[in-house]
């Protein structure tokens, strides 16, 4: 970590805690700043605030009092989840207090080069794939960012010989100014988080900030399957490396079932460790980063063939009596489940689906359900899921929860079949989040394996 004097004896307000705010507070204190933390959660329910107070950091909890900004703060570090129309943020802007993001703070002190990954879907899987391949190739890749490891915490142990492989959300990117990765990946761009950004154009503009400071000596990896990529590519100073599953490009591409990088065959799509058309795209982006980083083809192929996915994201859980289980609890919409289904033989597949409908058009799923061996349906959207199953002429059973659904699926499955949890719905009708839903699937698998 670079020891910089920019924040020495400067009064800085951290607005919002969570993991990133806590990490930023500790880093700034280490850099000699006079830190105040403000979080809306009450102090007695706020272990992070309690821990910071014990370290001598000033904390104000329970609300965001605008009058706090009457103090003479020289910077604000804003939690990514707090929108720019928040009264505290608006007041800071009116007072011309510079607002920093936690990832930019990490960038200021990083000795290690940064590979930044953003996009609407596939960020976590691609980030993890890239780190795995770099580490397999003898490099030292450190996961950081939106993947659960705050960048301003990871950067404190990173040295010049490391590489920060950083997952970045639109919330994290919208406020950056100086941030400059050496390699950036945009997996894809879809209309999401519009409640935060206001429009798709503003959402894209936030994502596009990842390359704002890049030069021709830096590399920007874009999804050439999307028309928007060609438009955006004309507006960057970075060297663009495209990837595509639909056409041959001057980068990474799929041709006749083989993944290539600039005419060099790397791996067959059927040899990838994770199924699904979206994972071919993720692998192509990873191949581009790996080749730019000097990783040998055989190491890339070996690593991608053994990659088992990320927890809850088309995660290969294991086998019982030659029946394979996949946990795709993160698939909370139709598109995600469609992509998951693309990687399997429907005739040998039992799909567990259903949950809280957030405006899905279930008829869109019907073509992807054709030929399924069986569906196990659950949750608030069960009636709509049943109608889709009927249109696809797929038989189904109902279950009260994921555990019961998994047990039913296992009873129906035969040697060589696959059981896939890919709900196509949110979890909140039955579970606090998709992680808890997926964990129930994993726990049930463990019980079934123990009884087998």
Swiss-Prot record:
Keywords: ATP-binding, Cell cycle, Cell division, Cell shape, Cell wall biogenesis/degradation, Cytoplasm, Ligase, Nucleotide-binding, Peptidoglycan synthesis. ATP binds at residues 119-125. This is UDP-N-acetylmuramoylalanine--D-glutamate ligase. GO terms for molecular function: ATP binding; UDP-N-acetylmuramoylalanine-D-glutamate ligase activity. NCBIfam families: murD (TIGR01087). PANTHER family: UDP-N-ACETYLMURAMOYLALANINE--D-GLUTAMATE LIGASE. It catalyses: UDP-N-acetyl-alpha-D-muramoyl-L-alanine + D-glutamate + ATP = UDP-N-acetyl-alpha-D-muramoyl-L-alanyl-D-glutamate + ADP + phosphate + H(+). GO terms for cellular component: cytoplasm. Gene3D superfamilies: Mur ligase, C-terminal domain (3.90.190.20), Mur-like, catalytic domain (3.40.1190.10), NAD(P)-binding Rossmann-like Domain (3.40.50.720). Pathway: Cell wall biogenesis; peptidoglycan biosynthesis. It is an enzyme of class 6 (ligase). Belongs to the MurCDEF family. The gene is murD. It comes from the Bacteria. It comes from Streptococcus pyogenes. InterPro entries: Mur-like_cat_sf (IPR036565), Mur_ligase_C (IPR004101), Mur_ligase_C_dom_sf (IPR036615), Mur_ligase_cen (IPR013221), MurD (IPR005762). One of its GO terms (biological process) is cell division. The keyword Phosphoprotein does not apply. SUPFAM superfamilies: MurCD N-terminal domain, MurD-like peptide ligases, catalytic domain, MurD-like peptide ligases, peptide-binding domain. It is found in: Cytoplasm. Its EC number is 6.3.2.9. The keyword Acyltransferase does not apply. Cell wall formation. Catalyzes the addition of glutamate to the nucleotide precursor UDP-N-acetylmuramoyl-L-alanine (UMA).
């Amino acid at each position: 970590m670079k020891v910089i004097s920019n924040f020495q004896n400067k009064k800085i307000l951290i607005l919002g805690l969570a993991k990133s705010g806590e990490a930023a507070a500790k880093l700034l204190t280490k850099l000699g700043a006079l830190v105040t933390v403000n979080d809306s959660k009450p102090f007695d329910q706020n272990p992070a605030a309690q821990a910071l107070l014990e370290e001598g950091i000033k904390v104000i909890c329970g609300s965001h009092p605008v009058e706090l900004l009457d103090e003479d703060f020289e910077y604000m570090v804003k939690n990514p989840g707090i929108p720019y129309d928040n009264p505290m943020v608006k007041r800071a802007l009116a007072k011309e207090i510079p607002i920093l993001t936690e990832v930019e703070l990490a960038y200021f002190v990083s000795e290690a080069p940064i590979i930044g990954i953003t996009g609407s879907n596939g960020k976590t899987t691609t980030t993890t794939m890239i780190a795995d391949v770099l580490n397999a190739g003898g490099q030292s890749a450190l996961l950081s960012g939106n993947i659960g490891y705050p960048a301003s915490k990871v950067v404190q142990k990173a040295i010049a010989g490391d590489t920060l492989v950083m997952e970045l959300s639109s919330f994290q990117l919208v406020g950056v100014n100086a941030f400059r990765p050496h390699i950036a990946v945009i997996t894809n761009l879809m209309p999401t988080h519009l409640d935060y950004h206001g429009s798709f154009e503003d959402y894209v503009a936030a994502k596009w900030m990842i390359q704002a400071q890049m030069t021709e000596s830096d590399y920007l990896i874009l999804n050439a399957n999307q028309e928007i990529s060609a438009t955006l590519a004309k507006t960057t100073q970075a060297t663009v490396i495209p990837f595509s599953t639909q056409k041959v490009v001057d980068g990474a591409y799929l041709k006749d079932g083989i993944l290539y990088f600039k005419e060099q065959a790397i791996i067959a799509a059927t040899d990838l460790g994770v199924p699904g058309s979206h994972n071919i795209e993720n692998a192509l982006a990873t191949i581009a980063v790996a080749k730019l980083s000097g990783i040998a083809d055989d190491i890339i192929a070996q690593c991608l063939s053994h990659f088992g996915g990320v927890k809850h994201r088309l995660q290969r859980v294991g086998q019982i009596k030659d029946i394979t289980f996949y946990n795709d609890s993160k698939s909370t919409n139709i598109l995600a489940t469609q992509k998951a289904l693309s990687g399997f033989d429907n005739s040998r597949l039992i799909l567990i689906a259903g949950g809280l409908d957030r405006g899905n058009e279930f008829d869109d799923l019907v073509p992807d359900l054709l030929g399924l061996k069986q569906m196990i349906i659950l949750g608030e959207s069960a009636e709509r899921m049943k109608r889709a199953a009927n249109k696809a002429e797929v038989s189904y059973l109902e279950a009260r929860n994921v555990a019961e659904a998994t047990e039913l699926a296992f009873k129906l499955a035969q040697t060589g079949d696959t059981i896939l949890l890919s709900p196509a719905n949110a979890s909140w009708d039955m579970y606090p989040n998709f992680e808890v839903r997926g964990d129930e699937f994993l726990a049930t698998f463990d019980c079934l394996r123990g009884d087998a």
